[in-house]
Amino acid sequence: LAPLGREIGLVEVQIGAIISASSLTLFLVSPFWGRASDIWGRRKILLIGLFGYSAGTVMFAGVFQMALLGYLVPLTALILLILTRVANATVMAAVSPSANAYMADITTLEDRIKGMGAIGAAGNIGSILGPAIGGLLASISLLTPLYFSVLLTLAAAVLTLFALPVLPKATVIKKPPRLKYSDPRILPLVVAGVLLFMGFAIVQQTIAFRFQDELALSGIETAKVVGFSLMFSAAAALLVQLLVIPRLSVRPFVLLRISMPIMMIAFGIMALGHS
């Protein structure tokens, strides 16, 4: 997104606004989709999220295409990109809560950790392959990775439609309980999660600009370099989750206390490095 935004004349703050609007929408809308999956069923909400994301990404890429062809000035493109990204995030937010809830419904209490781990592993594999494939596709054009992601999402939607069983009616809750972010049972975790992912978001939004400016890269070169750097980052995370974490017999909060200082050191090295 960073090199693509620069190609149409947007500056860093404007590109960051697009990403922030999307993230804020996901944060606000996800609880609604979680409750909706309790009422209308996991599979329906999951399909809404997958097909909706596909349509929203096509519109998002279409705005970029019009701007690249010169039909939109940067300000108009910015407004349309924010609107389409927010609309896209609104339906995309349905995917994660419905998929996790579906896994919880079809697994026993003993197998639930394995089931959720399978979802996490699938996400990590996607995080490894996605940036690498996107970086390679960017050599065709900066919009090609967006259109390719639409094809992948449509394939997932079709697979969900024809291969994912509909859960029995007994699993559907008519009046799901509401859980507020201010609930003292989860408030500390919510605050910690917000701060943690805020740090991740800052790095993800600025790393492409850093690479492009420090290494004097073109837009396509930036997409390739960032794609492969994200691939190696995701691969390292997956290896730690598979090989290190299972061998550590420590509580989750102890892991947080260990990992947070390591992350701070890593971010500091990234900030000071120039090559």
Predicted stretch roles:
Residues 29-41, 239-253:
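Helix-to-loop junctions at the C-terminal end of transmembrane segments
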